[in-house]
Regions:
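Secretory targeting signatures
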Residues: 1-21
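Extracytoplasmic substrate-binding proteins
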Residues: 23-27, 34-36, 43, 113-193, ...
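Short helix-initiation/N-cap motifs at beta->coil->alpha
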Residues: 30-32, 81-93, 132, 217-226
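A local structural motif
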Residues: 35-40, 75-82, 207-218
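A short, structured surface patch at a secondary-structure boundary
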Residues: 43-98, 102-110
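Alpha-helical, coiled-coil/dimerization segments enriched in small aliphatic residues
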Residues: 70-72, 194-220
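Short helices/loops that flank or line small-molecule/ion binding pockets
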Residues: 91-99, 122, 224-233
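Flexible, solvent-exposed loop/hinge segments that line or gate ligand/substrate-binding clefts
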Residues: 233-279
Length: 346
């Protein structure tokens, strides 16, 4: 009898331990690392704006206990405790003090490896996502759905994004080079920074049906001479405006218009086809991360091929995504200039 009672006691004691073991989930993050994280974590610190946005969109923002200052979409996230300006300079001591179940950071050097090691030494798991393209956004949505127990909502969100994404690829996937306009992409708030074929900027241009004039340059983010740009004579110019270049959470039309005029007025640029035809566009760098990346892709497609995408209204899609997932009204939000309206019927 005593033996049976002892076995029952041991079994009861083991149940919580076994349950704890079951409350783990293996995730392959954007860097391809297999990380074991808690299932259904109650406390998350986000150093990745796109991840914070998707967690909010899944209705689970209460789990987020702190964010970096660049996690500002939607702005409601800024009500969380600030843990630093960005993942590169996050307050590690405070993170360790808060002892979250999970930290989600950016990829590569944007969150130093030694910083991650300090957290994992304290038993805090770290996932990494930067989400500069749809092919990173959709897997992360699915990952967060699994982690948070919101797989159905995550699947619906991923399907929404995939539907818009496929509507682009179906039209541009087999497009011959002669039908693709040449594009110069001004990266990260610099006139002379761009991206070669290994960059996400190149992928965005190619998938939208364009030709990146910097595709064959040697470095991933080459710094080029403006004379070279003039000689290449791109048909379209797209400039990525950084958050340091405007005052609010998103830029104003006036701020983007001023930047566009600055580009058009660069010495010698009056001879470039993109300037002569008015195909110079400004985007907010925040459009290249999170759910807004899908709207950015639609804008690119519409800018490069207005006739092919005349049935698509990128701003309307952007508004639908903001309203449906972030409870935001697009009315006063402008992250591209000029817009790409749908052609009127008749």
């Amino acid at each position: 009898m005593r033996t049976i009672a002892l076995l029952i006691i041991i079994a009861v004691m083991l149940v919580p331990a076994l349950a704890a073991e079951e409350e783990k989930i293996a995730i392959t993050d954007e860097e391809g690392r297999n990380v074991t994280v808690p299932f259904n974590p109650s406390s998350i610190i986000c150093l990745s704006p796109g991840a914070a946005e998707v967690i909010y969109a899944l209705g689970e923002s209460d789990r987020i206990i702190a964010v970096t200052d660049d996690c500002d979409m939607p702005p409601a996230l800024l009500e969380k405790e600030s843990i630093g300006k960005s993942s590169r300079n996050a307050d590690l001591e405070r993170i360790i003090e808060l002892n979250p179940d999970l930290v989600i950071a950016k990829t590569g050097g944007l969150f130093p490896v030694e910083d991650e090691q300090k957290l994992t030494d304290y038993g805090i798991p770290v996932l990494r996502y930067r989400l500069l393209h749809i092919n990173a956004l959709i897997p992360m949505i699915e990952d967060l759905g699994r982690i948070l127990g919101e797989e159905e909502d995550a699947r619906d969100m991923a399907n929404d994004i995939s539907g818009y994404y496929d509507s682009i690829l179906d039209r541009t996937g087999t497009m011959p080079d002669e039908d693709r306009p040449s594009v110069y992409f001004m990266s990260m708030g610099h006139f002379d920074w761009t991206g070669n074929r290994d960059s996400t900027g190149h992928v965005r241009i190619a998938e939208a049906g364009g030709k990146n004039i910097a595709a064959d340059l040697q470095t991933k983010v080459p710094h080029v001479d403006m004379e070279w740009v003039i000689e290449e004579d791109p048909e379209v110019i797209v400039y990525s405006m950084t958050s340091e270049q405007y005052d609010g959470t998103t830029p104003t039309i006036e701020e983007m218009e001023a930047k566009r005029m600055e580009i058009i007025s660069l010495p010698g640029f009056e001879s470039i086809d993109a300037v002569k035809t008015g195909r110079v566009y400004i985007t907010d760098i925040k459009m290249s991360s999170g759910l807004s990346e899908m709207a950015a892709m639609l804008y690119y497609a519409k800018w490069l091929h207005p006739d092919l995408f005349q049935d698509i209204d990128p701003r309307a899609v952007h508004g639908e995504l903001l309203q449906k997932y972030l409870n935001m009204d697009i009315e006063d939000i402008y992250q591209v200039y000029p817009d790409a309206p749908v052609k009127s019927e008749g």
